[in-house]
Amino acid sequence: ITSLFASNTAPKSTITIICVPTVPLIQQWEEEIKKFDKLSSIIIAGTEKSNWKELLGPKLAPYRLNSDLTKIQNRTYVLCTNKTASNTDFVNFWNDIPSKYIQLIADEVHHLGAPDLQNIFNINSSRRLALSATPERQWDSYGNQKILEYFGKTVFEYDIKQAIRDGFLTHYTYHPLFAEMNIDEFQEYYNLTQEMKQEIAKHKQKEKKLGKELPLSYFVKRLLEQRALIKKKTSDKVKIFEDWCNSINQKQILVFCEDTEQMEDLISILNKTGKRYVNYKSDMKNSQKNQSLEMFKKGETELLLAIRCLDEGLDVPDCSACVIVSSSTSIREFVQRRGRVLRTTNRDKIANIYDIVVIPPKEIIPEQEDAADAMIKSEMDRVKIMVDCADNQTDVKQEIGEKLQYYEL
């Protein structure tokens, strides 16, 4: 809403391009614009049935013909997915339009640092606004720099602590649940760590030789992803989830899973316990997704299991708790997951966040100790961010201290 107010400070002849990562976010923006400016014209670019070229062409004709643009009475918004907005056809469509008539809003702007989306930065807009709860891309300083070059530095920041104090987000308690890697899982994690160290050393040597910063290679990123996946899918998480399931008596809980395989493991547990649940996956039809959200909203089901697609932006029905099974060291992922449960229509509500924290096995050989320490540090970095805004932070800090002492970490 704030970005729409900002966009309306420009003349009505200024066309507003709004870029978003997913189609559901296009739908949300469309709903907000219709409520905010009922007389506006909205062109959708990026959905299956989109005919944006036919719709946008006549809109841009007066700009190309040097017509009297002061006569324009209604604003035009172009809602598009990042994939469409970075397409050369879309970028070229704006080439002969003076930049003073174009403003661009990027929702979840961190996505635009990806190499295949950076073509968006060739749209010459005079006014630019980037939105993100987590604007920095992890392990991608090159992509971060590209975003800053186009949008400039941060102009306004509003953190979660302040939002909770101001009553825009609900208070919450944080509950870490510890899952231990088995020997085989940690050995694989250690092997990838050693391989990654070698590749990063080569990368730094190359940067030093060329005298400039370079984006990480695809191979290094793949190693990072493979190593992260071992933590996300640690087998002990399923048992921890089962124990949690048997001890909890809450309703309307979000469960964040890594992939379909992990989701199926959790579903088998829910079937045993008799708890009611629905799924929300990217490969579902929109009608199925909407049905799942509606059932969850009405309280017809106790749990909503999701794979990543609820991480960003999408408005999720009010819920009392979330379980992060697919725990991650990506600041963007866990901050956005926390945000899903803190949005509230009831200011008196206190949300509960259950986070499965992965720790190394006790039985490791001396040469693996550095990798074990680094792993627990990365997990604790996430835990610290979660704890710092929690109502029960004193109790949690004591619990974590005792757990780490027990594992001699």
Regions found by a protein language model. Give the residues of each.
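Inter-Walker segment of RecA-like/P-loop motor cores
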Residues: S40-N87
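SF2 helicase catalytic motif II
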Residues: N82-T84, N92-R137
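Conserved Walker A/P-loop ATP-binding site and its immediately adjacent core
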Residues: S13-D37, T260-E261
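Motif I (Walker A/P-loop) of helicase-class P-loop NTPases
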Residues: I1-A6
